[in-house]
Structure formats: structure tokens, C-alpha cells
């Protein structure tokens, strides 16, 4: 079939092209216009022919007309051919209005019956008929001209007879005789000034418009004197209407969007013409399914922006017959054609849409779920109205499908009697409703493991997990709805979405049951942990509703609370509220609720193992609840004896190693004291909020890299507290963050101590004791004695370099910034030399040929990287902060009279510095410490030559 069609049209086009070439080579009129040639397009769905060769040796691109002839000249844009009629007569031997329909016939299904060798040219009888019609038209025109001349002569005679005082009355010239249809359809024309007339020649396929010399003037004429209605009445093609009115259309829409938007301006007389034009669109299947920015297809525009019109229904019926529209397409509001048709209330359009195969579904109405019960009741009545509406249409077979969809997405929550009364359901539908109200099932571990291909656990662990599983219920999916477009958070690698269950707002955590085997096992253990804390009743932990299977995914459903503690503390408005009501009262309240939550977990024998502010939720009533039990484990679990690498969050995680005991098992075992460290970091965050009024994160960055705050904690080390922090809280948090777990207090001791501090603090309404300076007290208590210093191996750093800045692009910085960076690093080296006089640890910066800036940490012991924790203070706090702290220490100790140096010592120290072997390292020290005067230089030399005493204060007065 296709080969026959192609051969047929190939022969026709070859004959046309050969004759066209001969005519264009002789005719000077065509050559003077510099026209390449005409592209004759045969518009059919299964093939598309065109010729783009140039007769004058030029190769030009051109835009083809979707409906007929169009030309592209090398000097102008796409224009209409000036001499279309002359061209068609010369080449084809017939007028253009008869030649083109024969080549572009709509009924392409009859092609197989035609002989490909027969040339489609008009017969002599047809030519005679055409000539007779032309002669009749010419005679009519001559008669009209004669009538006009007679009228003009009569007017002149009247002017001569009229008296001179009175002005002559000019009669209005009568228009030429027209058909009745033209007189009814043609609107009054107002010729614009300085505008060329455009001749329109009618044909069966439409009109051929002459070339537009001034497109701006011509477009203004169409805008002023015509509309879509007028264009259709004048038998313009669809593309001609689009070209004349495209200024009104957005660039994101195609021309079908535009035409269907204004289709209600046409009349019933144009239906046949419009139906033909729809069939002639070459790529209509692509255009009819294109979506604009709003996600609307042309049929969406047809239904949304038009009132009731016969043409609108004709278009939908025509598209249904062609079977080219995808009725599953929805706009950005997730509304399909049926939804818009129901909102419009047009019964006939709904019938046509349903016949076309549009699915019976409504858009998700998640906003209604967040409102009160009244909106839910209105939702029920809307379901009733739709059911009655479908019954009136005679589409009872669609009702079960509609109800099934609505049950899964609308989450109807109401009493069964009310549903029966409102919806007037029959016996079968009542059974369907009752099936929705089945009680929730409890989870079974064995069936769960079989479904997700998980091997049986150890005997004791399996029995323990099975007992916990029985306490978790599997929710009815018909009552659940999850909005995947709204992600409200994340828990580890899992995403948390917003949803509703029986009208209640919920938070749905996606379980990775389709991931790796370890992820599936962790999912089971998290569900078991949920069952383990079920006995707590939600007083200190977030309330878990159950497990929901939704769209072939498994979700852990929890009650949606206000926000997490991290977001709460980072919100300035919430901090202002706490300050108005007494910020210390709020801090003590939050601290005690966190401690009580930890005690409740210990009562059921559970370790959370990931305490941080992001895993505590603030309820709608202001209570602090524990959440995210993805890493939690039972204390009797065997696998729990080894310390997993992924336990906890970096900044809140307990140091992995400490000088607590020599037993490796005790060293690696995770116990209650391991979580005390995380609580200490959380309390430190709360203290910073109370003292500074802003949230301070424990996450400390060294340039672009993140340094683990907790790994480098040394014995008796305390990070800095804001000025004015109560000494009792400083001591408590310091004891909670000790590297040795055995020395940390228990959770009950901490709760009692917080209660005592709260009573003392609130009763005195002030701070007792000496005010602390930022970092000063920490440094005074920092122990540098060698007996307490031990080396700790850093994994995966064998013979490697620690790159703090991967690539420092000096081209993006000027020379001033580069010098500041170098001075900044030299100051850091200076501080490191003061802290580390023996040179065990080096912190260096250097420049290479490739202009890469590295920060090397060099200290080798037994082939691995070892660091003296007492000398590694530079990685705990940003180095510029250490420098500032050091300057403040010098000033403070000078005020206290603890620095015992004189001018002689200063001079001697300066001389020693000049003769030092490491003079290159201190090259810029005098520049960077010039603001300190002589104290900075006096403290550098002795510290670099003599061993370090017990306290850091002794570094600066070691005599």
C-alpha cells in the first residue's frame, strides 16, 4: 500500500517538477523575483513529500505551508507567491482553484484504486466549465461597472441643476451585487490609510492570498477588521488564521491552543469547513497532545475557555473519531478533561469525553484534608452529586470505576450509616463500603520476611522481633493518601512525605524495602523498634500510626508534628517567643524533656544511637518527642556489640576511642554512656541559644572541609561557651563530653543536676560565679602533659595528604586576597608552633607550580598517621578563631599579671627568633603579630625551645 502511494505521488511530482523547471527557465517574471521554486506539499498522515532544490544554483532553507503552497525567497521571509494563478495556469494548464484540490485531496483512502500512471489533470470538460464560469464573472463585472458609470453621470447632472448656495448632496455608492451569504457574513470594512488591498480568491481548500509587502500594515488590518469568526466565514485556512492572529497567543502554545481558545466565535455554518481543515492538519496528532506551561492540551483550552457551542462539540467528536488524543493527560493541577467538563457542567461534553476514553478520576484534593470536618462532609456530598450526575447521563457502568478511584484517593472518613443514607447505595455497594471499614491487621514477621525475601534471624532475636511486630498494625490503604509532591523532610536515606489517613495529617517515611538486603533488614528492625516503644504511649516519643502499603511501596506512618527541634531553634521568631517568656525557663524545660525521653527508652531496653536536634520533634502542644528510630537497636541484639561505622551523625557522635580501659570489646561496645555525649552536644546548642540569641551549630568547618568535632576530643577538653554561661552548666556539659565514657554521669544524675541548677538559677535570677571568656577557661584546663597524650590512628590516611583546599584558583582573586590568605596561614603556623614546641605535629602551607594550596598534616608513627591529641587543637576550631583566642589570652594574662617578661627577655627572644632554624616558618610572624607588641614575640621563642608544662597558661610563663 505505501509503496503504491509513494510511487504514485513520485510520478506526479516528477511531472510537475519537469514542467515547472521548463517554465521557470523561460519566464522572466519568475526570474526577476529571485524565487527558488515552489514547495508543493501533500499533507497526509503516512507520508510527507517536498522539494527544496534551487533552479538558480542557490541552496535556501524554507518554511513549508502545512496546508498548501508556500515560498521562501533568499531576500525575504516566508511570503505568499505573487502570481499563484498565473503559475498554476502556465505549468498545470488549469486555474489554481481546481489544480490544488486534485493534488491535495482529503480522501486519501481511495489512493489504492487509482492508476499511478494516470496524470491527475483536469479534463477538457472541466476546463470548458471553468472558462464559462470566468466569462460569466467577467460579464457580471462589466454590468456592475456600467451601472456605476450611469450613477456617476446622474450625480453630475443633479449637481449642475442644484442652486449654488446649498451644498450638493452626494449619494452613497451602492456596493456591487453579492451573494446573500456574503452579505450576511461580511462585516463592514474600514479601509485603513496607506494600505494595499489584498485580493482573496476563493477555492474549495480555502483562499490564496497575495504577497504581503508590508506585514505590519496587513496584520493591523486583520486585527482591526477581522476576527477568528470573520476568518472562518471568509474560508481562511487554520494556519492563515493563526498567522493573522498569532500576536494574541503565548509562545508556549501551538496554534491549536489558540484556535481552540477562541473557537466559540464561529457559527454553525462553518462546521463543515472547520471539520475539513482539522482533517488537513499534517501533524495534528502531535499538536493535539502538546502541553503548554500550565500543562494544558488544546482540548483543555477548548473546554476551559469556551461556553457552550456546537463547534466545540464537533471538534471533540472529530478527535474521538480520529483516535489521536491521549485522554490520560492532566494539567499541572492534575485535572483531566473530565474534571474540567464536570466543573463546567456541560452534559454533552462529558458524554463525548467519556466516550473518548477519559478515565473517571478527580484531582487529588489534599488541601481539603488539612481542613476541618465540614469540608470533608462537603466532599461526601460532592461524591453523591457525581454519582447522580453519571446516573442521569446513563453511564451507570462507570460508577463502580469512579467509586473505586475515589475510595483510594479521597480518603472518605464518615460513618457507614451516613454514607448509606446520603449515597443511597444498593446491597453490593454496601458490601464494598463495609470492606473499607475492616479492622487493621497486625503485622506478621514471617510473612513479612517471605514477602521481602529476608532470611530468618537468629532464634532469640527472631522471637523478640516477632513480639514487637505484633504491636504494629498494617493500615487500610483505601483510607490513606500520600502527597509525593510535598516532601517535608528526610531521615537518613529515606524521604518523608506529607499525607492523610482518615482525615488526620500524617508524616510518611518511605522504607527502603526494594533496596539492598541490608536496607531491607534495617527496615525490619526499625519496624520492630516501633513496636518496642508502643508501650510508651507517645508521651516521650512520636506516635506511630502503623505501616501503610501505598502504590507498591511501604511507609511508616507517624502523626505529623509541628517541626523538628533543629528548625525550631533556627527560627528567629520562635527564639523571640522564648525570650519574651523567659528563655532560660524554655531551655531547662526542653533539656528535661529530652532527658526524660532517653530514660523512657532505657526502660524498654533500647538505644537510639542517633541523638541530634533534627531527630527531636516539637509537637503542636510544645512537647519534645523523640523520632527516627532507623538506627535504634535492642540492647540484647548480638549484632549490636560491634560499633557500626555509620552510627549517629558526625557532629553528635561519641568519640570512637578513648583512654577508658584496655579491653577492646569494652572500648567498642555502645552503651548508655555513649548517648550521654550526644546529649551534651545538644545541651551545648541550647546554652548558646540562651546566651547569644542565635543558633550555633556544632559543625565546624576548616575552609571547605568538615572536621569531626568529636574525634579529636582530649582528656579534660572543653569547647568554648558564650560569655556569661553559668559555671554549673559548664561543668555539667564538660563532664558529659569527656572522652572516657566511664567518667561520664548517668542520665538520672544529669536529670537531677539539671533540676538543681534550674532551682538555683531561677531563684537567684542571675549567674553565680566567675564569668567565663570564650575559649579562655578551656585553654587553662587543657592538659599538655605527655603521660596523658596518646596516639590515635586515622583510618585510610596511610601516606596521603590531607587537602583542606582542593584547588585554589588564584585567577579569581587579586593579589591582595592572596597575600591575606598567605598571612592567614602563617598565623596558623605560628599558633601551632606555640602549642607544639617539640614539632610532633606540623601544620604547613606551601605553593606549588600548579598553584594548588594544600594543608599538610605530617606526623608519622609506625607507618601510619598518628596525631598528638593535645597538639591537634587546630583542627577543632577554625584557625583564625584560635589566633584570636590566643591574642585574648595574652591580653588577659597581662592584665592578671601572669606574664613575667621584661624588655631584656623581649630583646633576647627576638634575637633567638632571628637565629632560629625554622626562620622561614616565622617569616611573616612579626607582620601578623605586630598588633600585640612585644608580648607576641616574647611568647613564641620560649615555647618553641622548652617542654610544655601542665597547663596552657604555662606556655607563656614557663620560667
From Swiss-Prot:
ATP binds at residues 488-496, 509. The lineage of its organism: Eukaryota, Amoebozoa, Evosea, Eumycetozoa, Dictyostelia. This is Probable serine/threonine-protein kinase DDB_G0291664. CDD domains: PKc. One of its GO terms (molecular function) is protein serine/threonine kinase activity. Residues 162-176 have a biased composition (Pro residues). ANK repeats lie at residues 294-324, 333-362. Residues 482-762 form the Protein kinase domain. Belongs to the protein kinase superfamily. Ser/Thr protein kinase family. It comes from Dictyostelium discoideum. It comes from the Eukaryota. GO terms for cellular component: cytoplasm. SUPFAM superfamilies: Ankyrin repeat (SSF48403), beta-sandwich domain of Sec23/24 (SSF81995), Protein kinase-like (PK-like) (SSF56112). InterPro entries: Ankyrin_rpt-contain_sf, Kinase-like_dom_sf, Prot_kinase_dom, Ser/Thr_kinase_AS, Ser/Thr_Kinases-Pseudokinases. It catalyses: L-seryl-[protein] + ATP = O-phospho-L-seryl-[protein] + ADP + H(+); L-threonyl-[protein] + ATP = O-phospho-L-threonyl-[protein] + ADP + H(+).
Amino acid at each position: 500500500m505505501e509503496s503504491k502511494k509513494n510511487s504514485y505521488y513520485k510520478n506526479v511530482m516528477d511531472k510537475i517538477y519537469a514542467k515547472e523547471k521548463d517554465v521557470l527557465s523561460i519566464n522572466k517574471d519568475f526570474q526577476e523575483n529571485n524565487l527558488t521554486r515552489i514547495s508543493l506539499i501533500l499533507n497526509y498522515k503516512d507520508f510527507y513529500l517536498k522539494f527544496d532544490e534551487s533552479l538558480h544554483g542557490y541552496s535556501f532553507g524554507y518554511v513549508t505551508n502545512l496546508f498548501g503552497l508556500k515560498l521562501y525567497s533568499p531576500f525575504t521571509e516566508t511570503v505568499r507567491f505573487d502570481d499563484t494563478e498565473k503559475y498554476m495556469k502556465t505549468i498545470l494548464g488549469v486555474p489554481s482553484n481546481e489544480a490544488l484540490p486534485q493534488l491535495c485531496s482529503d480522501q486519501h483512502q481511495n489512493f489504492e484504486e487509482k492508476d499511478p500512471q494516470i496524470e491527475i489533470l483536469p479534463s477538457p470538460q472541466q476546463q470548458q466549465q471553468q472558462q464559462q464560469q470566468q466569462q460569466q464573472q467577467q460579464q457580471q463585472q462589466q454590468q456592475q461597472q456600467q451601472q456605476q458609470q450611469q450613477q456617476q453621470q446622474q450625480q453630475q447632472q443633479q449637481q449642475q441643476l442644484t442652486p449654488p448656495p446649498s451644498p450638493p448632496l452626494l449619494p452613497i455608492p451602492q456596493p456591487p451585487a453579492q451573494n446573500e451569504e456574503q452579505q450576511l457574513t461580511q462585516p463592514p470594512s474600514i479601509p485603513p490609510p496607506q494600505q494595499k488591498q489584498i485580493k482573496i480568491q476563493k477555492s474549495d481548500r480555502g483562499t490564496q492570498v497575495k504577497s504581503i509587502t508590508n506585514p505590519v500594515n496587513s496584520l493591523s488590518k486583520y486585527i482591526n477588521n477581522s476576527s477568528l469568526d470573520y476568518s472562518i466565514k471568509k474560508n481562511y485556512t487554520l494556519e492563515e488564521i493563526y498567522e493573522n492572529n498569532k500576536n494574541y497567543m503565548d509562545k508556549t502554545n501551538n496554534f491549536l491552543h489558540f484556535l481552540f481558545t477562541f473557537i466559540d466565535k464561529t457559527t454553525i455554518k462553518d462546521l463543515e469547513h472547520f471539520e475539513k481543515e482539522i482533517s488537513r492538519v499534517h501533524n495534528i496528532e502531535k499538536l493535539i497532545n502538546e502541553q503548554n506551561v500550565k500543562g494544558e492540551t488544546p482540548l483543555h483550552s477548548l473546554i476551559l475557555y469556551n461556553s457552550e457551542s456546537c463547534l466545540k462539540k464537533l471538534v471533540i467528536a472529530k478527535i474521538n473519531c480520529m483516535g489521536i488524543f491521549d485522554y490520560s493527560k492532566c494539567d499541572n493541577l492534575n485535572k483531566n478533561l473530565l474534571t474540567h467538563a464536570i466543573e463546567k457542567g456541560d452534559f454533552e461534553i462529558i458524554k463525548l469525553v467519556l466516550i473518548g476514553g477519559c478515565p473517571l478520576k478527580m484531582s487529588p484534593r489534599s488541601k481539603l484534608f488539612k481542613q476541618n470536618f465540614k469540608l470533608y462532609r462537603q466532599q461526601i456530598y460532592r461524591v453523591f452529586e457525581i454519582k447522580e450526575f453519571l446516573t442521569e447521563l446513563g453511564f451507570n457502568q462507570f460508577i463502580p470505576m469512579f467509586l473505586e478511584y475515589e475510595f483510594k484517593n479521597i480518603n472518605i472518613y464518615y460513618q457507614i450509616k451516613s454514607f448509606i443514607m446520603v449515597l443511597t447505595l444498593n446491597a453490593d455497594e454496601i458490601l464494598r463500603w463495609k470492606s473499607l471499614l475492616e479492622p487493621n491487621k497486625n503485622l506478621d514477621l514471617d510473612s513479612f520476611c517471605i514477602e521481602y525475601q529476608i532470611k530468618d534471624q537468629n532464634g532469640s532475636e527472631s522471637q523478640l522481633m516477632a513480639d514487637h511486630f505484633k504491636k504494629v498494625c498494617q493500615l487500610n490503604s483505601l483510607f490513606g493518601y500520600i502527597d509525593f509532591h510535598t516532601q517535608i523532610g528526610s531521615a537518613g536515606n529515606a524521604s518523608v512525605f506529607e499525607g492523610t489517613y482518615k482525615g488526620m495529617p500524617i508524616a510518611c517515611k518511605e522504607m527502603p524495602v526494594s533496596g539492598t538486603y541490608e536496607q531491607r533488614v534495617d527496615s525490619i528492625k526499625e519496624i520492630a523498634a516501633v513496636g518496642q516503644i508502643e508501650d510508651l504511649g507517645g508521651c516521650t516519643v512520636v506516635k506511630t500510626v502503623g505501616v501503610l502499603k501505598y502504590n507498591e511501596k511501604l511507609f511508616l506512618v507517624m502523626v505529623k508534628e509541628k517541626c523538628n527541634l533543629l528548625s525550631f531553634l533556627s527560627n528567629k521568631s520562635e527564639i523571640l517567643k522564648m525570650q519574651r517568656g523567659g528563655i532560660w525557663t524554655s531551655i531547662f524545660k526542653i533539656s528535661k524533656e529530652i532527658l526524660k525521653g532517653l530514660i523512657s527508652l532505657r526502660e524498654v531496653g533500647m538505644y537510639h544511637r542517633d541523638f541530634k536536634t533534627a531527630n527531636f520533634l516539637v509537637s503542636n502542644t510544645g512537647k519534645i518527642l523523640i523520632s527516627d528510630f532507623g538506627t535504634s537497636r535492642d540492647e540484647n541484639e548480638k549484632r549490636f556489640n560491634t560499633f557500626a561505622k555509620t552510627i549517629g551523625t558526625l557532629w553528635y557522635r561519641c568519640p570512637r576511642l578513648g583512654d577508658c580501659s584496655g579491653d577492646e570489646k569494652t572500648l567498642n561496645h555502645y552503651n548508655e554512656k555513649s548517648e550521654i555525649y550526644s546529649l551534651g552536644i545538644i545541651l551545648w546548642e541550647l546554652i548558646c541559644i540562651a546566651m547569644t540569641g542565635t543558633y550555633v551549630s556544632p559543625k565546624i568547618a576548616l575552609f571547605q572541609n568538615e572536621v569531626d568535632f568529636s574525634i579529636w576530643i582530649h582528656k579534660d577538653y572543653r569547647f568554648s561557651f558564650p560569655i556569661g554561661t553559668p559555671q554549673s552548666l559548664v561543668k555539667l556539659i564538660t563532664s558529659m563530653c569527656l572522652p572516657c565514657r566511664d567518667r561520664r554521669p548517668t542520665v538520672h544524675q544529669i536529670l537531677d543536676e539539671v533540676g538543681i541548677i534550674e532551682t538555683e538559677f531561677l531563684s537567684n535570677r542571675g549567674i553565680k560565679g566567675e564569668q567565663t571568656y570564650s575559649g579562655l577557661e578551656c585553654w587553662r584546663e587543657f592538659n599538655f602533659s605527655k603521660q596523658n597524650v596518646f596516639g590515635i590512628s586515622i583510618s585510610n590516611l596511610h601516606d596521603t595528604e590531607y587537602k583542606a583546599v582542593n584547588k585554589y584558583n588564584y585567577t579569581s582573586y587579586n593579589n591582595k586576597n592572596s597575600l591575606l590568605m598567605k598571612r592567614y596561614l602563617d598565623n596558623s603556623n605560628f599558633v601551632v608552633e606555640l602549642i607544639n614546641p617539640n614539632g610532633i605535629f606540623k601544620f604547613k602551607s606551601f605553593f606549588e607550580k600548579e598553584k594548588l594550596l594544600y594543608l599538610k598534616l605530617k606526623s608519622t608513627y609506625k607507618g601510619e598517621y598518628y596525631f598528638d591529641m593535645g597538639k591537634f587543637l587546630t583542627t577543632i576550631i577554625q584557625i583564625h578563631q584560635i589566633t584570636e583566642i590566643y591574642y585574648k589570652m595574652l591580653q588577659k594574662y597581662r592584665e592578671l599579671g601572669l606574664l613575667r617578661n621584661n624588655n631584656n627577655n623581649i630583646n633576647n627572644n627576638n634575637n633567638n627568633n632571628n637565629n632560629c632554624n625554622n626562620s622561614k616558618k616565622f617569616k611573616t610572624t612579626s607582620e601578623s603579630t605586630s598588633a600585640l607588641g612585644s608580648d607576641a614575640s616574647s611568647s613564641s621563642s620560649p615555647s618553641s625551645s622548652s617542654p610544655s608544662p601542665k597547663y596552657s597558661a604555662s606556655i607563656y610563663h614557663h620560667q
